[in-house]
Amino acid sequence: MGFEGRYVKRLDTDLQRKALRRLRYIEAAQTLEDLRVPPSNKLEKKTGDLKDFYAIWVNAQWRIIFKWKDGDAFDVQFIDYH
């Protein structure tokens, strides 16, 4: 994976910090089960149009979704869930 960790002006700084923490969890994970900790990640397999994705919570509104294969996350996206 790999990300730059730069802040953007359009999003709240606290939200960005939480998202960056979650991205670090994803980057460090060796298995999907690793992402069940902490429980606040609320790891879930998506359905419907997003059936190929997994998601973890950033907060009630925002999710990080990603695909997982052979111990690596890819197609990582930060989405407004509502």
Model-derived features: positions:
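A short, surface-exposed loop/turn module that caps and links secondary-structure elements
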Residues: 30-54
